[in-house]
Amino acid sequence: MASIETLVEEIGKLSLTEASELVKALEEKFGVSAAPAVIAGGMAAAPAGDAAAQEEKTEFDVELKAAGANKINVIKVVRSITGLGLKEAKEVVDGAPKVVKEAVSKEEAEKIAKELKDAGAEVELK
């Protein structure tokens, strides 16, 4: 037993490259493969609803649905959020519904949505 523990300790000290070489040498020596075995029939797929419930969305898109009555203030907010020029920001607002910001954290998306709503826009997080 002591020799097995010593062997495990020595293997633990190997670098990743050395460990890879060890695996290749053992595969050749014993005629085996380190690849996982394929099970006939495979695993049962989990229902899609369960996976969606377990996995919380981490990235959100902020979509401008409509500019509302105060279009000028919405354009100003879109400019500050996106860094676009006046013409480009106006095109985004006029072309609503449009995504204003993509793949942002939940907190940032909520902050952006609040700014746009305060300016009079209709906003949706996706």
From Swiss-Prot:
Keywords: Ribonucleoprotein, Ribosomal protein. Signal peptide: none annotated. Gene3D superfamilies: 3.30.1390.10, Single helix bin. GO terms for biological process: translation. This is Large ribosomal subunit protein bL12. NCBIfam families: L12. Homodimer. Part of the ribosomal stalk of the 50S ribosomal subunit. Forms a multimeric L10(L12)X complex, where L10 forms an elongated spine to which 2 to 4 L12 dimers bind in a sequential fashion. Binds GTP-bound translation factors.
